[in-house]
Amino acid sequence: MKIRLTDIEYPFVTAGTVFTFTGEHPFDKEPVDFMLCEYHSGKADRCEFAFYCVSGYHSGSLEYVLPIEAKAQGTVVAVSTQWLKEHWKSHVYGGCKACDVTLTNWIWDQNEKYKSNTKE
């Protein structure tokens, strides 16, 4: 099952989530997969997450280390969904908008629990 990044109501995503989009140069014009991975850069202005390309010719390449502002609030070790929605094109990958990104390998049951707990 896939879901668009912009359709996610859950406040964060965790390591192992795969983000799929249609690539442009330097990627092939076919689906590109970025996986959110833990990455401890040791720099104060970076959080402990990065995107690695996990498809095609660039598979295994480190693509982007996320800034500290991307970290989800609270004690959870995750990335803010809102930050990704707002900064996908400007920070993560400039070749597409957040509405063109789909997620797979995401924690669906937590999303359903979150939805049911936030309804009045």
What role is predicted for each listed range?
Residues P11-E24:
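Short coil-to-beta transition motif at edge beta-strands of beta-rich domains
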Residues D7, F27-K29:
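Intrinsic-disorder/low-complexity loop/linker signature
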Residues S55-E120:
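Intrinsically disordered, low-complexity, charged/polar segments
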Residues M1-V13:
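Mixed-charge, Lys/Arg-rich low-complexity intrinsically disordered regions
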Residues K29-I68:
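Basic/aromatic-rich interaction segments and small domains that mediate binding to polyanionic partners
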Residues T22-H25, H40, W83-L84:
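Generic secondary-structure microfeatures
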